[in-house]
Structure formats: C-alpha cells, structure tokens
C-alpha cells in the first residue's frame, strides 16, 4: 500500500517490562491475601495441606503467562526432557578438558561410564519404557538342606557324648564303627518319613478329591431335584392358569350368548312394533285417501247431475216427452261403505244415460 496505508500509532506505556502490577500493594487480591494471613515472600497455598512438603520457590513467584506458538503438546518444550539437547562428540571433548585440568584417568573413566549408563537408560526408556527390577525369593529344590544339616549336627553331638562315656580305646573304636554304621540310619529314616508323609498327603488329597466329587454330585442331584420340582410346580401353575382362563372364557362366552339372545329378542320386538305402526299408518292413509276420493267423486257426481238436469230440461222442451229416472231400488247404506255404493250407483246411472255418455265421449248430439 505504501504511504496510502492506514497508519497505526503505537504508544509506549510507562511500564514496558510489565512490572507495575507485581509491585502494586493496593490491589484487591493483595489486600485480601494479607487479611487472610499471607505476607509477601511466603509460599502460595495452605501451610497445613498434605502436599505442603512439595512446595518450592515456584510457589512464591508470580504465575507467568507464556504464549504458545508451536504445535507441541501443553507443557512440552523443545530441547527438554530425557535425551534432548545433547550435542554429538561432547563426551570426548569433556574427557579432553578433564585431562587438561589435571584429572586422573580413573575419574575420567568413571565419568565416561556414567554417561554411557545414561545413554543406555535413555535407549531402554525409549524402547520399553521405565523398567524396575524387584528382588524375588530364593528357589528351594527337592532336598531340604537345613533339615539335613541339623540331623548331621545331632548325630555328631551323640557321637561326642558316647566317646566321653567310653574309657577304653577299643570301646571308642567299636562305638565309632557302630555309630558310623548307625549314622546314615536317621537320614534314611528321615527320607522314609518324608516319603510316608508324601504318600499320606497324596492319599489325603485323593480322599479330599473324592469327597469333593461326591459333594459335587450330591449338589448336582439336589439342584436337579429342585429344578424338577420347580418345573413341575411351574407346569401345575400353568395348567391352573389355563383352566382359569378356559373357565373365564366359557363364562364370558355364555354371558355374551345370553346378551346376544336378549339383544336379538329386543330387536325382534322392535321390528314387530315398527311393522304394526306402519300397518296402522297405512290403514289410516288409505282411509284418508278413500275419504278424499269419495269427496272428489261426490263433487263430480253433483256436477254431472246438474248437467243431466240441464240436458233433461232441454230434451223435454224439444221432444216434449218427460224422461223418468229409474231408481236403483236400493236403500242408501249407512257407514263407511255408503260413499262407495253411491259412487257405483252414479256410474250405473251415467252409463244408462245417453246424454251423459255423449258428454263423456265428446259426441255432439244430433239436432
């Protein structure tokens, strides 16, 4: 950008080394720690804590902040740790400096050996990690040496006692021979006793193993018997549950059947009542239709009678012969059938009258 770039002005502070905050005694934290019993120069942390013995001078210094500008892990540093920061050929140079300073060859060799041991330790740590050797116990063979030595000492003590009691050299020689002959006996007896002990131990182990096997078999039988009992009980319980379920199902089915029968009967009754009501309504409608039809027919008959009377008057005037209407000869019935009978009588009269037929069939009368 050059001169046209934005200018960033940096103002130097009065405390370039950033030591003002460490020397400030008026801050809140400094005053609070003083009120709790801390004095400048003491370690940070509780004095009576379990880890107080591990406090060092670092606990008295300030907490320093370091900017992390690498890809290493937290707390890792380049050139620190085991095997880091060593120069090749430095051992030979240190030996040369030691000789020039007047050190003896023994001291130089000792230092060289220490450096070589350090290199071996570094290599082993890199390859297998930290190794610690722990001292184990002493391996004991088949023979118990302490018991054999004790037996020999006891035999020697017996020999000394017998030699003191005997006075003659012959008796001493004979006693020595006898004791020499007897001396291997306790060892053999000891060996025999050890063999017997071993045999007894083996027999005890066999008997214990047999007992354990018998116990295991008895336990297995008991467990099998218990399992059989549990299975039989479970089967019985299942059967009882099935019986209960079947009974409950039968009762429920019978109840449902009774309910269904009652519902069917109620439906039948309702259907019968509906049919009766429909029949009654139909009969009532038919009666009303008959009454309406009879009223209409009576009106029509009255009109026809008027037409007949008019036609009869005309014919009487023309022909001058009176027309006599024939009576049905039947008495008018009373009741519901009277309307029907009237309608039938009117039809008969109309069919017998020529003028009315002409009017019905739209035939003009001849004048």
From Swiss-Prot:
Residues 282-296, 310-328 have a biased composition (Low complexity). Residues 15-27 have a biased composition (Polar residues). GO terms for cellular component: nucleolus. Residues 167-182 have a biased composition (Acidic residues). GO terms for biological process: rRNA processing. It comes from the Eukaryota. It is found in: Nucleus, Nucleolus. PROSITE patterns: G_PATCH (PS50174). Residues 25-79 form the G-patch domain. Keywords: Nucleus, Ribosome biogenesis, rRNA processing. Residues 1-28, 156-336 are annotated as: Disordered. Belongs to the PINX1 family. This is Protein pxr1. It comes from Sclerotinia sclerotiorum (strain ATCC 18683 / 1980 / Ss-1).
């Amino acid at each position: 950008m050059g001169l046209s770039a934005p200018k960033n002005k940096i103002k130097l502070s009065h405390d370039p080394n950033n030591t003002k905050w460490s020397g400030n005694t008026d801050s809140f934290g400094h005053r609070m720690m003083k009120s709790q019993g801390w004095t400048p120069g003491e370690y940070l942390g509780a004095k009576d804590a379990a880890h107080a013995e591990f406090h060092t001078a670092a606990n008295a210094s300030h907490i320093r902040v370091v900017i992390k500008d690498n890809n290493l892990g937290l707390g890792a540093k380049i050139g620190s740790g085991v095997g880091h920061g060593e120069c090749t050929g430095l051992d030979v140079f240190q030996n040369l400096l030691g000789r020039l300073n007047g050190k003896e060859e023994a001291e130089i060799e000792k230092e060289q050996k220490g450096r070589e041991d350090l290199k071996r330790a570094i290599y082993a740590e890199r390859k297998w990690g930290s190794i610690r050797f722990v001292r184990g116990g002493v391996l004991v063979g088949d023979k118990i040496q302490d018991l054999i030595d004790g037996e020999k000492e006891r035999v020697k003590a017996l020999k000394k006692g017998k030699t003191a009691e005997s006075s003659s050299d012959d008796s001493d020689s004979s006693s020595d021979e006898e004791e020499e002959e007897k001396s291997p006996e306790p060892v053999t007896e000891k060996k025999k006793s050890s063999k017997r002990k071993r045999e007894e131990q083996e027999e005890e182990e066999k008997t214990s193993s047999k007992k354990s096997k018998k116990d295991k078999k008895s336990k297995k039988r008991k467990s099998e018997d218990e399992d059989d009992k549990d299975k039989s009980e479970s089967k019985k319980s299942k059967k009882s549950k099935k019986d209960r379920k079947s009974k409950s199902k039968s009762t429920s089915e019978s109840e449902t059947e009774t309910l269904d029968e009652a519902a069917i009967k109620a439906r039948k009754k309702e259907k019968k009542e509906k049919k009766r009501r429909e029949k009654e309504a139909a009969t009532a409608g038919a009666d009303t239709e008959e009454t309406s039809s009879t009223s209409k027919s009576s009106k029509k008959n009255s009109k026809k009678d008027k037409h007949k009377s008019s036609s009869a008057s005309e014919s009487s005037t023309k022909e001058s012969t009176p027309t006599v209407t024939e009576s049905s000869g039947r008495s008018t019935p009373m009741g519901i059938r009277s309307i029907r009978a009237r309608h039938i009588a009117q039809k008969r009269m109309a069919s017998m009258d020529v003028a009315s037929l002409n009017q019905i069939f739209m035939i003009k009368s001849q004048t």
